[in-house]
Amino acid sequence: MAKLTKRMRVIREKVDGTKLYEINDAVALLKELATAKFVESVDVAVNLGIDPRKSDQNVRGATVLPHGTGRDVRVAVFTQGANAEAAKAAGAELVGMDDLAEQIKAGEMNFDVVIASPDAMRVVGMLGQILGPRGLMPNPKTGTVTPNVAEAVKNAKAGQVRYRNDKNGIIHTTIGKVDFTPVQLKENLEALISALKKAKPAVAKGVYVKKVSISTTMGAGVAVDQATLDTAN
């Protein structure tokens, strides 16, 4: 058996894997166990009661967290004309059409989010094999294909998170940094859960939000008691 690191031993001693933690207790535990030499992200895994094999039960979308994610987000926008000027004014780092596509083909990928106006999709469509595997392909469901690119840029900068269930029906995303206050992390988590509930597929049956766990980048998952969250039903 592999030898446990000191950190893993402490986590095993502190975290009860069979327990649902009140949200404030869960956050306090994460902060106590966050001993990495960098400011760790706080990640969430939400198990949904869906059948991910069926396309009409897949959950995908985006929501702006009230306190952001703590990350500086670099945005690339495919658009032209007045929309290009609006995107720059909103804070986009990269704006263009064919010229931007050529940069990406050359391997210049210094951005975290890609946004496109509908008329630019003819250009973006040719980048599917590059952007797709990286989760960067613009999509109307996540608000990244839109006529109002300026608003999309502002949302991305304000701490918008995009979510999509994996093959096991689990949503993985980030809700902030470990140096956020407990209130900020709680309200960000509540905003995400509320958005997921609004995105519930009409055909999904039974319990929809089955389990909510939070963790830091280097830590173990802590299961949250949903009754201690203030979310829309």
UniProtKB/Swiss-Prot annotation:
Q: Which UniProt keywords apply?
A: Repressor, Ribonucleoprotein, Ribosomal protein, RNA-binding, rRNA-binding, Translation regulation, tRNA-binding
Listed under GO cellular component are: cytosolic large ribosomal subunit
The organism's superkingdom is given as Bacteria
For whether the record's keyword set contains RNA-binding, the answer is yes
Which InterPro entries does the record match to this protein?
A: Ribosom_uL1_bac-type, Ribosomal_uL1, Ribosomal_uL1-like, Ribosomal_uL1/biogenesis, Ribosomal_uL1_3-a/b-sand, Ribosomal_uL1_CS
| Alphabetical list of PROSITE patterns matching this protein | RIBOSOMAL_L1
Show the GO MF annotations. Answer: rRNA binding; structural constituent of ribosome; tRNA binding
- Span-the-membrane segments of this chain are none
A Pfam family name for this chain?
Ribosomal_L1
CDD domains in the record: Ribosomal_L1 (cd00403)
A GO biological process held by the record: translation
Protein's job: Binds directly to 23S rRNA. The L1 stalk is quite mobile in the ribosome, and is involved in E site tRNA release.
Q: How does it assemble?
A: Part of the 50S ribosomal subunit.
Question: Hey, which family's this protein in?
Answer: Belongs to the universal ribosomal protein uL1 family.
Protein name per UniProt: Large ribosomal subunit protein uL1
Q: Which organism is it from?
A: Shewanella sp. (strain W3-18-1)
The opening ranks of the lineage are: Bacteria, Pseudomonadati, Pseudomonadota, Gammaproteobacteria, Alteromonadales
